[in-house]
């Protein structure tokens, strides 16, 4: 594929990933059927990428419905992904580059697409039973991060108003939605009441609203690792939890927070 075409395709995929992070509906607004569908970014609308897209969407749905992120790396789920089409009710494509002029093969062959896959709930529930899991029917929490972040400059506390926190806010919301949850970034007024300051994050307070979970932590980029290093704390159902991650990128650090909340809220034994 010509270099110019490759550049356009990579650019479109980057835009698609950003849109995917914010386009999903609120998890609290979702009904159970919405949890049984997922969207992946694939190349073209033929069979080259469809099996991979189906497998990715099946994995995502199994995790969302059960609340068990450990299924992501479960070898049994990887094997099920080889036959994911057996559980599909319907699927559809949307051209990521719709409205962008055609550039070489991108017009007919290599254009990236959103592949949205809907699975049969009964089949998914049966698969979960075979995996030793059950559908999580409880109300899903809203994740509220109380975080101090630092890369090269001085640390800062992520707030709803912070101008240079836009990327972090979008990333955190997108990672929550990947797992069927929602996020709410606290205001500066809330953070002041909680006693949060750059580099100094207190124990997580009781959430101000029902069905919210406050996760306290620090996230710092360390060249010696290299990568982001984060540590998190939360209190849920009278128990304190602490976990963390190191040597990952920005998005994966936020995923680690969401996975921990997901496991605990869905009744599993801990954030890891």
Predicted regions mapped to residue ranges:
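A short, hydrophobic beta-strand-centered structural micro-motif
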Residues: 89-100, 145-147, 185-186, 195-230
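Bacterial N-terminal signal peptides
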Residues: 11-21
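N-terminal segment of the mature soluble domain
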Residues: 55-79, 139-198
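N-terminal Sec/ER secretory leader and immediately downstream segment
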Residues: 35-85, 89-98
């Amino acid at each position: 594929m010509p270099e110019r075409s490759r550049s356009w395709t990579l650019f479109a995929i980057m835009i698609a990933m950003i849109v995917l992070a914010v386009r999903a509906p609120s998890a609290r607004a979702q009904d159970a059927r919405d949890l049984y569908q997922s969207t992946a970014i694939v190349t073209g609308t033929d069979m080259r990428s469809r099996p991979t897209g189906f497998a990715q969407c099946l994995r995502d749905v199994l995790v969302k419905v059960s609340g068990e992120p450990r299924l992501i790396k479960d070898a049994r789920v990887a094997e099920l992904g080889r036959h994911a089409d057996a559980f599909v009710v319907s699927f559809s494509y949307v051209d990521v580059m719709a409205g962008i002029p055609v550039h070489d093969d991108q017009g007919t062959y290599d254009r990236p697409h959103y592949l949205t896959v809907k699975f049969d709930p009964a089949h998914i529930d049966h698969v979960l039973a075979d995996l030793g899991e059950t559908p999580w029917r409880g109300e899903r929490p809203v994740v509220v991060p109380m975080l101090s972040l630092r890369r090269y400059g001085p640390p800062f506390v992520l707030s709803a108003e912070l101008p240079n926190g836009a990327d972090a806010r979008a990333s955190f919301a997108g990672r929550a939605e990947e797992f069927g949850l929602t996020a709410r970034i606290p205001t500066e007024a809330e953070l002041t009441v909680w006693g949060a300051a750059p580099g100094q994050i207190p124990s997580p307070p009781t959430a101000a609203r029902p069905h919210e979970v406050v996760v306290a932590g620090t996230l710092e980029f360390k060249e010696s690792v290299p990568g982001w290093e984060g540590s998190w704390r939360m209190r849920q159902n009278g128990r304190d939890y602490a976990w963390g991650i190191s040597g990952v990128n920005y998005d994966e650090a936020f995923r680690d927070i969401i996975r921990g909340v997901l496991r605990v809220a869905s009744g599993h034994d801990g954030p890891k």
